[in-house]
Amino acid sequence: MSQQVIIFDTTLRDGEQALQASLSAKEKLQIALALERMGVDVMEVGFPVSSPGDFESVQTIARTIKNSRVCALARCVEKDIDVAAQALKVADAFRIHTFIATSPMHIATKLRSTLDEVIERAVYMVKRARNYTDDVEFSCEDAGRTPVDDLARVVEAAINAGARTINIPDTVGYTMPFEFAGIISGLYERVPNIDKAIISVHTHDDLGIAVGNSLAAVHAGARQVEGAMNGIGERAGNCALEEVIMAIKVRKDIINVHTNINHHEIWRTSQTVSQICNMPIPANKAIVGSGAFAHSSGIHQDGVLKNRENYEIMTPESIGLNQIQLNLTSRSGRAAVKHRMEEMGYKDTDYNMGHLYDAFLKLADKKGQVFDYDLEALAFINKQQEEPEHFRLDYFSVQSGSSDIATASVKLACGEEIKAEAANGNGPVDAIYQAINRITGYDVELVKYDLNAKGQGKDALGQVDIVVNHHGRRFHGVGLATDIVESSAKAMVHVLNNIWRAAEVEKELQRKAQNKENNKETV
């Protein structure tokens, strides 16, 4: 029987570093639930010591997730480990992942230390983490540029200290697959207690070979792969988990290992991450790109029609991509919409049926026919905007032309009060944004604007994603409508609600901190 490769997802920790705007706790939980449904073994969900907000989101996910092991990152620093344990302790079981650099360059220039001191610190911190949990992972940062003999010393000491998983990262995406496999093989040859730990790998894509490096390491004996959905991450990104997972499945004949992933959830999880993180998937992206199963060559098309295996090494259905598109109309009842959502793999918790059906009827009245991609877009927006709103778009009107200055009139519900303003702008969208900013008084700077069609044809839904800068922080907003000006207005209102909610969360965190301080003084 083949051995299992543990899938360790770091989309919510390392992957998030690539985003232009930080995710809210609710958005992180949405992604965590999708990852749990896909069956990841371990999910690294944050760096709790970095901020009160990250602490809260790690705690929320740890409290909610039951079928995947929740993990948090900590440097080899006492406070990091203690805070990580505090955030994770609400989980039934959890992992602490601690790390320190081991390469000569990092030790000399970053840590200004010695290898012996690094080993001593690693041992102490692994033991400290073991006081909180028996599931401790230790990473040798920049292992790819660490001499194997040095690496073996660190690994042996960390295992003796109690680390159950040893992670070997190619932190800067520098090594070649044959080199990386050699590092893993070298550790198996040099570390006498290596059988007491699982060897993990964490690769980056700076040279475009993160997946190749991970697979080479698995072939050499690594039994955990770390990565992120869609390969998101800082610089050129992380190892794309969906690619590793499907490579292991498709080429089990030579790799002879398996994962416990539910492959039929890959496509949906990939889409969830892409939409929430506002990171579109390239059409030519392996496994999950829109062109991954497209055949434009006449020869290829003929071959696929005769036998799909002529040019397809896996099927769209194997990753959960249902290519059958059905349409509904305004005469379709609630039960029909719910049934179609179930057929597409959605659970009741993925959307609010009442809100979704209302949005469906409005769209059906406009378009006549509503397709699967419309429903999925509506369900996504429905989930993003289900929280209480302080701002709500009540009305807007725009006048613009090729030689006229665009003018917009906007009515906005601000709490219980309706406010109205008009403004000019450089085009209809800018005019609306100027009017909204006048109403709210929020000082926001638009730094990114994306428009994507959700479907086909002139009546397709248009999704607008924006990122704004507000007092040094970046916030993401999304809007959906068949009218792109309306989508743009909704996106700005969504972003303002996110800013408002962030301020409310900050007030609540300050209140909790003050209460904690008052309790200390009382004692």
UniProtKB/Swiss-Prot annotation:
Cofactor: Mn(2+)
GO (cellular component) term, any one: cytosol
EC number annotated for this UniProt entry: 2.3.3.13
Catalysed reactions, as listed in the record: 3-methyl-2-oxobutanoate + acetyl-CoA + H2O = (2S)-2-isopropylmalate + CoA + H(+)
InterPro entries assigned to the protein according to its UniProt record, in alphabetical order: 2-IPM_HCS-like, 2-isopropylmalate_synth_dimer, AIPM/Hcit_synth_CS, Aldolase_TIM, LeuA/HCS_post-cat, LeuA_allosteric_dom_sf, LeuA_bact_synth, PYR_CT
Stretches the record annotates as Regulatory domain: 392-523
Gene Ontology annotations of biological process type: L-leucine biosynthetic process
Binding site for Mn(2+): 14, 202, 204, 238
Pathways per UniProt: Amino-acid biosynthesis; L-leucine biosynthesis; L-leucine from 3-methyl-2-oxobutanoate: step 1/4
Predominant place of localization: cytoplasm
Role noted for this protein: Catalyzes the condensation of the acetyl group of acetyl-CoA with 3-methyl-2-oxobutanoate (2-ketoisovalerate) to form 3-carboxy-3-hydroxy-4-methylpentanoate (2-isopropylmalate).
Family statement: Belongs to the alpha-IPM synthase/homocitrate synthase family. LeuA type 1 subfamily.
Protein name: 2-isopropylmalate synthase
Species for this entry: Salmonella typhi
Taxonomy of the source species: Bacteria, Pseudomonadati, Pseudomonadota, Gammaproteobacteria, Enterobacterales
